[in-house]
Structures are given as C-alpha cells and as structure tokens.
C-alpha cells in the first residue's frame, strides 16, 4: 500500500487519519501541533490527531514551527508517496511538499475556491449558505490555491452549527480522500485549476467578531451563534456582562421595540434585533455560570427583567 506522511490537529484530522489507517495505508509519520495547557489547572491537552496516532503506535512529530525545524529534516528523508493534510494549522515548506513521490494532498472543508483560509466551515454558517462541502486539492506554496482533484457538496441544515458540520465534513472528507488517492495510482485522477475570479477568503474568526451587534437582524445573529458553536461562542453584553448564546431561533413576528430590548420573558426569552426582527434564546451561559437551557435561566436571573426594557448593551 502507498506510504503517507499525515499532518493534522483537531478531530477533523483524526477522522481522516483513522480512515487512512483502516484502509491499510502505510503511515510513516504523523505531524500535529504541540500539546497545549488548558483551563485553570493547566492540564496538558494532546490533539485528537496525536491521540489517534499514539493508539496505533505511529511516530508523532510536534514542531512549534515546521519550517527550519529538526523534525522537518527527519521528515524530508522519508519521501512518502503522499503527503496528506487535514486541518493541520501551519504553512508547509515547498521543499517538503515536493518530497512526496506522487502528490501532496489536502482535505479542505469547503467547495474551493470559496473559503480559502483557516475558518471555511465557520464562514459557510456565518454567511447563511445553504451548501458547503469538501475539496481534495494539491498543496502548493500559496494558501489553498492548488488544483482541485475532487469535490463533494453537502447541504447545510437550518440547525447545523460549525460543530455538526465539522463532524459531517470530516466523514465526507475521509471518504472522498479514500476515493481519490487510488486514482493517482491507476492514472484516472483529474486536476482542475481554481478560478481566481471566484476566490473568497475565510480568515480565522477574530475576538471582535464574537460579539453579536445590535445592527444584526435576528437571522444574522443566529447565523453567528451557529457559526461560533461549539467554540468560542457568540455573546451579547447583557447588564454590562458577557452573556453567551449557544442556541437561538429567529421568529417570524416583528416588534416595534428598538434593537436590544426584551420583548418577553414569560415562558420564553425573546429580544429585539435590527429591523424589528425577534430572536428567541434557547440555550445561554451567563458569565461565571455553566450552559443552561432557557427554562432554567427564566427560573432565576432571567425573571428579573421586564418587557420593553433595554437589556443588551452596544
């Protein structure tokens, strides 16, 4: 079976790696981001890809920066048939990409050339797209700009979040990769250059983008909430404190209240957004609290507000 160096970090990558292992590919090395200390107790956290690699006794490399590292020198000696990446999180040196005997291949979570960059799945939800997908593409020096070998589309459901799409697309990407790699061997692989006129970028989500603005309609706010679930979460400033909203629902009803006003907190919690649109909150997280459904919130702090009160700060 063909030899592979695999590079990836989150669960999206581990699903793809597991697929290569299950299919019998000879995984010579796994490269992932360094372990991180997380939480107040600074517990060491290994990436999902590292955990999968260790489970199968595969050699793991974790350079803080691959370019110029000792690890790169070792990896260059392997000269695998394929270099495969799936959500690795670093630029790869061109000389390393060229060390693959057959091809350096990336599993990308969008229908390229739409959403080049580090957050393609989040932007597909944020922009209210009805469809996303995966692309198997050649890795080149320029970010996500290589020729396309194969693509497969996936509908985005109204209740999809970035989290649910990560799970769906990791499976779709795994399966499409495993369909595509044999085509290199039998000579049937096709390559399609990307249309540069249709390129859309999806840079990593900034801290500023995490806040729900009162200039947003209920639908736009809901798209942001879904896009930032499960991480890092979208928030409003409620009573001067950060208030995360994990799940919400735009309503058909309209209100005359200005944006940021409580419409009702009787049995449900509805706030006004731009254009008189209404957003019903379903799962929330006040500062210093755990996530809770809206019923629990209304039984406590949420009962203290009154309809018509401006509760969301700019």
From Swiss-Prot:
It catalyses: L-methionyl-tRNA(fMet) + (6R)-10-formyltetrahydrofolate = N-formyl-L-methionyl-tRNA(fMet) + (6S)-5,6,7,8-tetrahydrofolate + H(+). It comes from the Bacteria. SUPFAM superfamilies: FMT C-terminal domain-like, Formyltransferase. GO terms for cellular component: cytosol. Gene3D superfamilies: 3.40.50.12230. Keywords: Protein biosynthesis, Transferase. Coiled coil: none annotated. InterPro entries: Fmt, Formyl_trans_C, Formyl_transf_N, Formyl_transf_N_sf, Formyl_transferase-like_C_sf, Met-tRNA-FMT_C, Met-tRNA-FMT_N. GO terms for molecular function: methionyl-tRNA formyltransferase activity. Its EC number is 2.1.2.9. Disulfide bonds: none annotated. The keyword Protein biosynthesis applies. Attaches a formyl group to the free amino group of methionyl-tRNA(fMet). The formyl group appears to play a dual role in the initiator identity of N-formylmethionyl-tRNA by promoting its recognition by IF2 and preventing the misappropriation of this tRNA by the elongation apparatus. Belongs to the Fmt family. This is Methionyl-tRNA formyltransferase.
